[in-house]
Amino acid sequence: MSYEALFSPFKVRGLELKNRIVLPGMNTKMAKNKHDIGEDMIAYHVARAKAGCALNIFECVALCPAPHAYMYMGLYTDHHVEQLKKLTDAVHEAGGKMGIQLWHGGFSPQMFFDETNTLETPDTLTVERIHEIVEEFGRGARMAVQAGFDAVEFHAAHSYLPHEFLSPGMNKRTDEYGGSFENRCRFCYEVVQAIRSNIPDDMPFFMRADCIDELMEQTMTEEEIVTFINKCAELGVDVADLSRGNATSFATVYEVPPFNLAHGFNIENIYNIKKQINIPVMGVGRINTGEMANKVIEEGKFDLVGIGRAQLADPNWITKVREGKEDLIRHCIGCDQGCYDAVINPKMKHITCTHNPGLCLEYQGMPKTDAPKKVMIVGGGMAGMIAAEVLKTRGHNPVIFEASDKLAGQFRLAGVAPMKQDWADVAEWEAKEVERLGIEVRLNTEVTAETIKEFNPDNVIIAVGSTYALPEIPGIDSPSVYSQYQVLKGEVNPTGRVAVIGCGLVGTEVAELLASRGAQVIAIERKGVGTGLSMLRRMFMNPEFKYYKIAKMSGTNVTALEQGKVHYIMTDKKTKEVTQGVLECDATVICTGITARPSDGLKARCEELGIPVEVIGDAAGARDCTIATREGYDAGMAI
C-alpha cells in the first residue's frame, strides 16, 4: 500500500510538515538530573527524525522549580535553553522538526514519588501564584523559541493543573477561577494568551486536550469541551491534540492504553469533537499500523496522527510503513511494562520496551565486531532470540539450541489469554526474525555438558527459561488438579466449577481464559488477587472479573486438595478473623508461579572448559519479559 494520505504534506502556520505523523510527547526519564540533555536523548529523537517523523514533540517540561517532578526536564533557565538547543540542532540536521510540551503538573506529580519516595499534600493556589504560573507558561514559550523549537504544545489534559481548573470534579474554587464554566476556563485562556504572545506569528501552537472528561463525580460536558477548544482557537491555538484520560479515576487507563483496549479505541471519540471545532486535529490512541493511520487521515477523522509507543517499539516504524515493509515492524504489544510502569517506578533510570530493549540506547548503535565468535545460545525463548538477533546483526555467529519443537514457547502461551493476541503475534514475529536473519536453530535439542564440549563455542549464553513451581500441598497429584501450562497449551479445558489457585499475573489470565470459555471460576490467592500485576493491569482486573463473574478469595492458604475439593484457611484482611473451609469444585488449576530452570550444571561445565558464560532471563531467576529481553540485548552487545 502507498498510504498517500498518511504521507501527504501538511502546513500549520509557517511550519511545513512532510507527512501527517507526529511523535507525541512521552516521558522517557532521560533528562539528566532534571536539567541536562545527554547523547541518549538526542539519539532517541534523531533516530525517529531520520526515519521520517514529521514532528517530534519533546516530552513535557517543568516551567518552574516547584513542582518539578524528578523525571522531567526543566525550561526556566538559560542553562535549560542551551541544553535543549543541542537537541533541536541535532534533529534539524537529521531532517526533522521539534515541538515541546509546556506543562504544569498541579497535584499529579505527587503520584510520581520523588527519589526519597515522599508525598506532600498539595495546597490551594493563591490568585497571585496563579498569575505567576501564567507568566511562567509565557516565559517557557519564549524560551522554547530561543531553544530552536518549531512548535509549542500546551498540555491541558490528564488531570494536570490546567485540567484541574477545567474539570468541575476537581475545581472547587469559589473565586474568579472556579464555579461557572467561564471561570473554570479562565486560567487556560490566560495561559493560551501568554503562550501565543511569546511566540512568533508563524509558529504553530498545539494544545493537548481530552476529547472526553469522564468517570468522575462531575465532568466537563461535550458541549463545554467543544466551546473551550473553539475559544482557545480564537485566542491562538492552531491544532487540538486530542487524547483521553485523567489521573483520578479508572480513566487513567486511557492515557497509556494497555492491551485490554482495542487498537484505535479512541478514533470515533476524537472524530466526534473534530466535527464540532474550527481547527485541525491530531489524534492518539493505540494506532499501531500504517493501514489504520492512513485510514483516519484519508477519511478526514484526523489531520495529524500521533504514533507514540509504536515508534518506541520500532524507531524505523515510519520507514517500514513507507517502504511497504510492515512485516518487519517490531510492534508494540500494549504491555505498558517498559514505558508506563518504568515512568512511575523511581528505580528505573529510563523507559524501555519489551519488544525493543534497545529503546533509549540508540546512542550505542549496533557496532560490528572485528572478531566474529561462535556463540551457543541455550534456549530459544524471547531472551535467547533477542541475544541471537543482536549478535547476528553485529557479525557474530550465534546458534540457538532449543529443547522443544518451536521458538518463543513461553511467550506464545502468554498470547493465549483473552485480549493478548498481540503477544502471540510477537512470539511468531520473533521466530520469523531469527529465520530472516539466517540464524541457525537446532530444535528438539537438549543441551548437556557433553553438547557444550562437542560444539566448542567461544561463548555461551544460557537462556533456558523457567519451569512450573509446584507447591507442596497434600493431594496435589489428584486427577482433577491441573497446571497452568496444561491449560495454556490446550492440553486440558476444565469446565464447570473451577478453582484457580495462585492469582498473580498468570493466574488472573488463566481465570479469565477459563471463564471466557464458560467455566464458573473461583480465584484463590494467598495475598491479594492480582498481586504482582502492573497498575493499569490491576485497574482492568476488577471490571473484567465482574464481567466474567469470577469470584475472589484473597488472603487464602490452600491446605489440602482432593478429588473435587479444596481445603483452605482464610484470613480476613480487616478483622484478621481466621476461618477454615472446604470449596467444592469440578477441577483445580495450579498457577502458583514459576522458578528458574536448573542450569548450574551447564554453567559449571562452561567454566571448567574456560568458556565465557552468562545466564539471562528467567534462567537467572523468575522475572517479567521486559527485563528478560533487555538482558538478552545486553548479552548480545557485550560479546
Swiss-Prot record:
<feature type="binding site">
    <location>
        <position position="286"/>
    </location>
    <ligand>
        <name>FMN</name>
    </ligand>
</feature>
<feature type="binding site">
    <location>
        <position position="383"/>
    </location>
    <ligand>
        <name>FAD</name>
    </ligand>
</feature>
<feature type="binding site">
    <location>
        <position position="402"/>
    </location>
    <ligand>
        <name>FAD</name>
    </ligand>
</feature>
<dbReference type="Pfam" id="PF07992">
    <property type="entry name" value="Pyr_redox_2"/>
</dbReference>
<comment type="similarity">
    <text>In the N-terminal section; belongs to the NADH:flavin oxidoreductase/NADH oxidase family.</text>
</comment>
<dbReference type="Pfam" id="PF00724">
    <property type="entry name" value="Oxidored_FMN"/>
</dbReference>
<dbReference type="GO" id="GO:0030573">
    <property type="term" value="P:bile acid catabolic process"/>
</dbReference>
<keyword id="KW-0088">Bile acid catabolism</keyword>
<dbReference type="InterPro" id="IPR013785">
    <property type="entry name" value="Aldolase_TIM"/>
</dbReference>
<keyword id="KW-0753">Steroid metabolism</keyword>
<keyword id="KW-0560">Oxidoreductase</keyword>
<protein>
    <recommendedName>
        <fullName>3-oxocholoyl-CoA 4-desaturase</fullName>
        <ecNumber>1.3.1.115</ecNumber>
    </recommendedName>
</protein>
<feature type="binding site">
    <location>
        <position position="420"/>
    </location>
    <ligand>
        <name>FAD</name>
    </ligand>
</feature>
<keyword id="KW-0411">Iron-sulfur</keyword>
<feature type="binding site">
    <location>
        <position position="353"/>
    </location>
    <ligand>
        <name>[4Fe-4S] cluster</name>
    </ligand>
</feature>
<dbReference type="GO" id="GO:0010181">
    <property type="term" value="F:FMN binding"/>
</dbReference>
<keyword id="KW-0408">Iron</keyword>
<dbReference type="InterPro" id="IPR051793">
    <property type="entry name" value="NADH:flavin_oxidoreductase"/>
</dbReference>
<feature type="binding site">
    <location>
        <position position="208"/>
    </location>
    <ligand>
        <name>FMN</name>
    </ligand>
</feature>
<dbReference type="InterPro" id="IPR001155">
    <property type="entry name" value="OxRdtase_FMN_N"/>
</dbReference>
<dbReference type="InterPro" id="IPR036188">
    <property type="entry name" value="FAD/NAD-bd_sf"/>
</dbReference>
<feature type="binding site">
    <location>
        <position position="410"/>
    </location>
    <ligand>
        <name>FAD</name>
    </ligand>
</feature>
<feature type="binding site">
    <location>
        <position position="101"/>
    </location>
    <ligand>
        <name>FMN</name>
    </ligand>
</feature>
<keyword id="KW-0285">Flavoprotein</keyword>
<feature type="binding site">
    <location>
        <begin position="308"/>
        <end position="309"/>
    </location>
    <ligand>
        <name>FMN</name>
    </ligand>
</feature>
<dbReference type="GO" id="GO:0016620">
    <property type="term" value="F:oxidoreductase activity, acting on the aldehyde or oxo group of donors, NAD or NADP as acceptor"/>
</dbReference>
<comment type="pathway">
    <text>Lipid metabolism; bile acid degradation.</text>
</comment>
<feature type="binding site">
    <location>
        <position position="447"/>
    </location>
    <ligand>
        <name>FAD</name>
    </ligand>
</feature>
<keyword id="KW-0288">FMN</keyword>
<feature type="binding site">
    <location>
        <position position="335"/>
    </location>
    <ligand>
        <name>[4Fe-4S] cluster</name>
    </ligand>
</feature>
<feature type="binding site">
    <location>
        <begin position="155"/>
        <end position="158"/>
    </location>
    <ligand>
        <name>substrate</name>
    </ligand>
</feature>
<keyword id="KW-0442">Lipid degradation</keyword>
<feature type="binding site">
    <location>
        <position position="332"/>
    </location>
    <ligand>
        <name>[4Fe-4S] cluster</name>
    </ligand>
</feature>
<keyword id="KW-0479">Metal-binding</keyword>
<keyword id="KW-0274">FAD</keyword>
<feature type="binding site">
    <location>
        <position position="339"/>
    </location>
    <ligand>
        <name>[4Fe-4S] cluster</name>
    </ligand>
</feature>
<keyword id="KW-0443">Lipid metabolism</keyword>
<dbReference type="GO" id="GO:0046872">
    <property type="term" value="F:metal ion binding"/>
</dbReference>
<dbReference type="GO" id="GO:0051539">
    <property type="term" value="F:4 iron, 4 sulfur cluster binding"/>
</dbReference>
<feature type="binding site">
    <location>
        <position position="337"/>
    </location>
    <ligand>
        <name>FAD</name>
    </ligand>
</feature>
<dbReference type="GO" id="GO:0005737">
    <property type="term" value="C:cytoplasm"/>
</dbReference>
<dbReference type="GO" id="GO:0016042">
    <property type="term" value="P:lipid catabolic process"/>
</dbReference>
